[in-house]
Curated annotation (Swiss-Prot):
Taxonomic superkingdom: Eukaryota
Keyword field: Heme, Iron, Metal-binding, Oxygen transport, Transport
InterPro entries documented for this protein: Globin (IPR000971), Globin-like_sf (IPR009050), Globin/Proto (IPR012292), Hemoglobin_a-typ (IPR002338), Hemoglobin_oxygen_transport (IPR050056)
Species annotation: Chelonoidis carbonarius
Family: Belongs to the globin family.
Name listed for the protein in its UniProt record: Hemoglobin subunit alpha-D
PROSITE patterns on file: GLOBIN
One Pfam family here: Globin
Binding site for heme b: 58, 87
Domain Globin: 1-141
Length: 141
C-alpha cells in the first residue's frame, strides 16, 4: 500500500520521465534482455540489437502503460485489466518477467536521475512497480 507521500514522489519523478518514455523504455528492455537473456524468447520476431526500432517502439508502449498506472494509482486493476488479459491469455508471458522488467526500469531511473533517485524514491517506485506487477499477474490465478 502506497502512502500519500510515496504517491506524490512517484508523480513528481514521473514528470522527469515524460519526454523520455521511448528512451527509458528501450533502455529498460535492453537491460532486461542482457541481464535476463531468457526473456528474449517472448520477442522472437524482434530485432534485439541496440537501439532497434522495434525495441524503442515497445519500450515506449511499456512506459506509456506505466504512465497510465501512475495517473490511476488508486485503481490499478481497472487501469491495467486489458494489459493483464493480453499478457495472460494471448501472449502467455511468465509473470516473473514483470518483476524483472520492473527491476531494470528502476536501474534506468537511477541512472538518469542520479542524486534525485533517493532511497525514498526507490522505495516508492519499488512498491509501485510491485503493485503493477501483481495486477498484471492477477489473471494468471
Amino acid at each position: 500500500m502506497l502512502t500519500e507521500d510515496e504517491k506524490q514522489l512517484i508523480q513528481h519523478v514521473w514528470e522527469k520521465v515524460l519526454g523520455h518514455q521511448e528512451d527509458f523504455g528501450a533502455e529498460a528492455l535492453e537491460r532486461m534482455f542482457t541481464v535476463y537473456p531468457s526473456t528474449k524468447t517472448y520477442f522472437p520476431h524482434f530485432d534485439l540489437h541496440h537501439d532497434s526500432e522495434q525495441i524503442r517502439h515497445h519500450g515506449k508502449k511499456v512506459v506509456s502503460a506505466l504512465g497510465d498506472a501512475v495517473r490511476h494509482m488508486d485503481n490499478l486493476s481497472a487501469t491495467l485489466s486489458e494489459l493483464s488479459n493480453l499478457h495472460a491469455y494471448n501472449l502467455r508471458v511468465d509473470p516473473v518477467n514483470f518483476k524483472l522488467l520492473s527491476h531494470c526500469f528502476q536501474v534506468v531511473l537511477g541512472a538518469h536521475l542520479g542524486r534525485e533517485y533517493t532511497p525514498q524514491v526507490q522505495v516508492a517506485y519499488d512498491k509501485f512497480l510491485a503493485a503493477v506487477s501483481a495486477v498484471l499477474a492477477e489473471k494468471y490465478r
